[in-house]
């Protein structure tokens, strides 16, 4: 009889622990809300500038000038090999990956400016559809 009570208490403790862990877990829905503040970092200043412009035109997020002000960080790694390709991931301020986006290249958008074209392709084909698909 006493054994059953101990088992029930242990099970209850376990369930409460799981519920509390689940309540603290965050996913993309929690970060990618309208009005979220994003800090953009990249190995290329022009990619940062074009991304800021694209986010401003989109009007869904707001860009900030420091990681401390941001809700999340958008890391954009630009590489050139025939076309500009951007590998993107959204990360938390403590460097946990929220979402990795498929890499996009400047060929996809046929823009005269290859960096701007790669940014445009990334946002138009990956980031914006993913974000709007969450809600």
Question: Language-model segments: what does each one mean?
Answer:
Residues 42-44, 77-78:
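Generic secondary-structure microfeatures
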Residues 26-37, 44-54, 58, 96-135:
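C-terminal/domain-edge helix-coil "capping" segments
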Residues 61-71:
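Short acidic low-complexity segments
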Residues 37-40, 65, 75:
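Structural recognition of the beta-strand scaffold that forms the well-ordered cores
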Residues 9-22:
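Bacterial N-terminal signal peptides
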Residues 71-115:
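Mid-chain, structured segments of secreted extracytoplasmic proteins
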